[in-house]
Amino acid sequence: MNINLTMFGQLIMFTMFTWFCMKFVWPPIVMTMEERKKRIESGLLAAERGRSEQEEMQAKAQEMINQSKDQAAEIIANATRQASNMVEDAKDVALKEAGKVKAQAQAQLEQDTIQTRNELKNQMSDLIMQGVSVVLAKEVDVKVHQKMLGKLSQSLS
């Protein structure tokens, strides 16, 4: 056999093998590679979307936390204001009640003072009557009367 003929035969076989591979083997391999490429691209896009959605959700969560903190601070401020108002109202009520109690005590003191003065006047009038009856029981003497009235005034003061 001739080397050229062998080479020519191998060239024909290689061409047929290449044509067969290009016609029947290569398209499924290329199609499988394209499908995998598309699947990988869609996976990467989904991962990127997931990452961006995660960042958005984290931003929203942080915003909600900040809003909650602001609301909590506002609630605390309102509660503090309300508590101070309640304390002020209680102080006002206590001062009014203290004023009433003071006025009642003052009125009671004045009433007791008047009652004591009346009792003292009654006792004084009794003592004066006793002194007058003693003076009248004895003889009417100016010197003696002045001494008795002096003793009476000393006993009264």
From Swiss-Prot:
Job description of the protein: F(1)F(0) ATP synthase produces ATP from ADP in the presence of a proton or sodium gradient. F-type ATPases consist of two structural domains, F(1) containing the extramembraneous catalytic core and F(0) containing the membrane proton channel, linked together by a central stalk and a peripheral stalk. During catalysis, ATP synthesis in the catalytic domain of F(1) is coupled via a rotary mechanism of the central stalk subunits to proton translocation.
InterPro entries: ATP_synth_B-like_membr_sf, ATP_synth_b/b'su_bac/chlpt, ATP_synth_F0_bsu_bac, ATP_synthase_B_chain
Source taxon at top rank: Bacteria
Family, similarity comment: Belongs to the ATPase B chain family.
Protein name (database record): ATP synthase subunit b
UniProt topology in membrane: Single-pass membrane protein
Transmembrane segments: 7-29
Subcellular location(s) of the protein: Cell inner membrane
Subunit composition and interactions: F-type ATPases have 2 components, F(1) - the catalytic core - and F(0) - the membrane proton channel. F(1) has five subunits: alpha(3), beta(3), gamma(1), delta(1), epsilon(1). F(0) has three main subunits: a(1), b(2) and c(10-14). The alpha and beta chains form an alternating ring which encloses part of the gamma chain. F(1) is attached to F(0) by a central stalk formed by the gamma and epsilon chains, while a peripheral stalk is formed by the delta and b chains.
This protein's record includes keyword DNA repair: no
GO molecular function terms attached to this record: proton-transporting ATP synthase activity, rotational mechanism; proton-transporting ATPase activity, rotational mechanism
Any one GO CC term of the record: proton-transporting ATP synthase complex
Keyword Transport: yes
Keywords: ATP synthesis, Cell inner membrane, Cell membrane, CF(0), Hydrogen ion transport, Ion transport, Membrane, Transmembrane, Transmembrane helix, Transport
CDD domains: ATP-synt_Fo_b
Gene: atpF
